[in-house]
Amino acid sequence: MKKLISLFIIFFTATIAYAQHSQTLYYMDRLPQITTMNPSSQPECNFYLFFPGVAGTSLNIGNNTLNYNDIIFENQELDSLVTFLHPTSNINDFLNKLEPQNDIFVDLSATIFGMGFRAGEGYFSFNVMQKSGLRMSYPKDLATMALKGNEAFLGETANLGDFSFFSNNYLEFSLGYSRKIYDNLTVGLKAKYLSGLAFLESKDFNAGLYTSSNGDSLSLTTDILLQGTAPVTISTDSSGFIDNVEEPETLGINDAFQNPGFAIDIGGTYKLNDQFSFSAAIIDLGFINYKNYVHNYTVNGQFSFTGVDVSNQIGDDSNSDPMEELADSLQESVKMEYSQENFLQFLGPKIFLGGRYFVGERLDFGFLSRTRFYAGSVNQSFTLSANTRPIRAVSLSLSYSVMNGAYNNIGAGVALRLLPFQFYVMTDNISMGMWPGKTRSFNVRFGMNFVLGCNKAKRIRNDTPMIR
């Protein structure tokens, strides 16, 4: 068991890095970062440079069912904060707030290097990023079993099979180009070379636990496939159980480029007239071929448990051990297999659809739909925003989003240019400060860019259909 826990920790910690997108960013088109959400977008300035460590860091974390106050809340009798696990808390109140299926997510990304420049009516960009994502989806039955035991399922089978786990950490090297092909249409394409660093997924997870009506026997049925990569060497015993986990003595730079992949981003912006424009993009459409330090583990079988009788062990000098016999029975009933076969992992693509209404040169209103696919499920969000550019050096955005089953997401973004530097910070959840107890998710993005040629870019855009 300790070896299994150690292996999970290695997988888990290997996947936590830096973060992804804020909805508010999409229409802050004075920032070079807009090309990460739509490759047809062209930054305001003729040239930009991203420095390692300061160009952009982003964090997105949350879930789709529970608010902060569902987990931590005030106990008036104790005059203190308690969790739902406190002895005075009603665990049923917590369970009743769960959906049949519940999602938890963490997105992280960091810009390592980037550069872009305008060439006539086109715009080139090159970026190096580290991206990570973690998703866990669990059924309500699993939470009920964990918190109340199997007494809630007497004579029934608890559904544990809708559990899924997905975690990915990779490097991304992208080369993008955006160009106006008609007076009112701009298109963009970004090609990405990917290098997988660590990965873990419950590819198939079918499991159920049956409890007899009198509670004196259990029957566990499993059909599970786990796939992952991590810089460890795993050995198993004759029954397929993990026997040993070893880390390599040294890791070279070449080890970071042994899991290659490829992806593309495609986008377009259409300017209907001086007041309306529309945009669409598909990003992260691709895959990674994992073939280095690959680990595949399957668990299949059915195991029945009726308890352990230790009464016969009293005064018995024999060498029989009931717990050892139980372990032997488990090994005989459940088949485990370990392999190192290569596998393809497809990224979770995202689709952005946007519309914009321009009141004038300095003010516009935007609508954005984002559809995100991951681990066999779909996450949908919508954003309305008001975007203003009161002076040349400042741009502001105020947004309202419906996301993760919550309707109280108010966001804001600020970009300030002090040539040759541009500073920015944004979030979709400043409402967290107003209603912290009702918060289900939070994201923030901030950084600094080096930019040049911004005034010239304005003159060029007056002759091209760039969204402002």
In which residue ranges do the predicted regions lie?
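Bacterial Sec-dependent N-terminal signal peptides
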Residues: 1-23, 355
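Subset of outer-membrane beta-barrel
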Residues: 20-468
